[in-house]
């Protein structure tokens, strides 16, 4: 529209009036060979389970977020889309659903607000002498941001889910929280996803699991739940209640984050 300018970002951050101006179609290429950013962080765990930071570039998608500005302090909502460039040539994604979560990096990885990191709470505990040699990694977790619960630990994000055939199953904004017990300290953490009117919709679209049911929350479990998923598969043909799940390859702010179960 006349008088509006479109600004965009490629790192998950919210577009501002200082973000790059969209003036012509973007030329996007597969960013997988670029250096790791989020998966290179060390402050996402207190676990002593031999966490190894990836020493080669992980697969990456292009996450584009855009918003319109009128120059008078008003802006539209943010539109986000994740592009998986040349992934049809990557065997690891054959016969697998793909899920993308995009959120402002501050929401996950900043020292003050990030829910995926040890954060400022951990640093304050260090300074106060609450952290000392002999504490287990589970005890250390008490002083981290990823151990926070409740609404204060919820952050806005954009969710996209594509089926094994590439069909879009979900594409909407939602809230995310870290979930679990000791797995909160794992580098690959589980999430709870919340659909709320203030983000976009009151419920997730009822296309999942062939139930016709709309869900206001979904669980995105890390690969630690593989054993549970295996047990479910053993009894799914019997008259027993089992948890429905969708195995999916997850990308967090464009970086590959591993296999999860939705």
Placement of each model-derived feature along the sequence:
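Short, compositionally stereotyped local motifs that mark structural "simplifiers"
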Residues: 1-156, 161-173, 197-198
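Conserved ATP-binding subdomain of kinase catalytic cores across diverse folds
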Residues: 101, 126-262
